[in-house]
Amino acid sequence: SHVKNIISAFVRYAVDEDYISKDFTRNAKTYAAKESKRSDLKFLENDELEKLIQSVKESDATTSHMILIAIYSGARYAEIAGLTKDDFDFENNTININKSWQANDQEFKATKTKTSNRVIDMPHDIMELAKSWTFGERYAFESTTGLPPTNNAVNKQLRRYLEKNDSKIITFHGLRHTHASYLLSKDIAIQYVSERLGHADVNITLSVYTHLLDKKRSIETQKALDELQKL
């Protein structure tokens, strides 16, 4: 229905902005949409992530390149699909997020929020690998249609890798959560992670990754008590 389409559009926006973790309208019937829960948030564990990276690096498929960029940048699908070759700065090892690809309209549009426009620092070896990729003239990542691969296409490719590696199944958007979860698990400051993700507010990051932060808090509490005990 028209109303469901409007609701779905808002939900997709909320997922992109990480206000919620899952598009609960995707397979929902009109009369019974389920609410999203934080427990639906899925991300790869470190061993699963390492296996995925190894598999992706061995492929020259455009969808594989997009997966690799998602892993190391934490960018959204629309942001990665919206990249052009000029957005890759190989001298400074950065990618410039300044627009997004809108598949329905088949055109570039502004990013979701002002803070979504950002320059993301990338690992040197990943940018060296990207130098060998063949970028399209209009889009960095072009499929045989001359347009960026669809969200469905990159999700299918990702699923093939995960199934082959016997890893948990996540979506392409789940790579964004994996990126953030990995950095937070390595004690990277949440303010920096929030900026890297392009969140409008650090509170969004705090709310999305509360499960990880609660776990880290218990560890930090014990460390603090151990230090205080030495006084």
Q: Predicted regions span which residues?
A:
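Short, basic (Lys/Arg/His-rich) helix/loop patches that form interaction surfaces
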Residues: 54-64, 73, 120, 135-139, ...
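N-terminal core-binding DNA-recognition domain of tyrosine site-specific recombinases/integrases
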Residues: 1-19, 23, 38, 147-153, ...
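Proline-centered turn/helix-capping motifs that create local helix->coil transitions or kinks
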Residues: 15-25, 90-93, 130-133, 137
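Catalytic-site neighborhood detector that most strongly recognizes the C-terminal catalytic loop/helix
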Residues: 101, 127, 197-223
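Short, polar N-cap/turn motifs at the start of nucleic acid-interacting alpha helices
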Residues: 87-94, 188-210
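Basic, Lys/Arg- and aromatic-enriched nucleic-acid-binding interface segment
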Residues: 1, 5, 16, 20-77, ...
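Conserved tyrosine-mediated DNA breakage-rejoining catalytic core shared by Y-recombinases
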Residues: 29-30, 82-132
